[in-house]
Amino acid sequence: IEKGIKIKMKTEKTYAGIPKEYGSAEKAKVVLLPVPYDGTSTWGKGADKGPQAFLEASENMETYDIETDSEVYKQGIYLADAITELDSPEEMVEAVHGTVKDYIKRNKLVTMIGGEHSISIGAIRAFSECFEDLTVLQLDAHTDLRKEYLGSKYNHACAMYEAKETTNLVQVGIRSMDYTETLVMDRDNVFFAHEMISDDF
């Protein structure tokens, strides 16, 4: 484990209660990485409870997929131990970055369960270092394009700034932003909510 990573939530369970033969780190094609982090939320708290709620709900769903006519979990889904770095947003981002990059190098499809938006910074950084011409699709009400907020560039309001600088960022559903973010956004890659509800969209 990379220096700076703190593991607080360990699990012996598998995702959605799938058989253990499909939930091992070695055989799984997919890694689910819980990051119950809520350190920079500035209005409502509670995003840190998301991963646990998601995992509990997963145990009550059907595992057969109608669209693919298959049981997709048989490709293997590994539920990794949660990263819960609480000391600072900088250390959390580094922890996520190191862990995600390690799994990518092991040829795993990494999916994170959060957590507030700042957890995306480390993951996007890891993917952009491993893949050329990366496109990031952001579905969100806010652009999160501030270079810094409340003294940190790792704040939830800055979650997409680095992605804008290093990847092809496409933002969909935007309905609220700060004026300063209009100066850095790529207007051709932003789809505002009020435009999407029109008949001409």
Where are these regions (language model features)?
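Short, Lys/Arg-enriched N-terminal segments with co-localized hydrophobic residues
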Residues: 1-8
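Conserved alpha-helical scaffold segments that buttress catalytic/binding sites
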Residues: 8-201
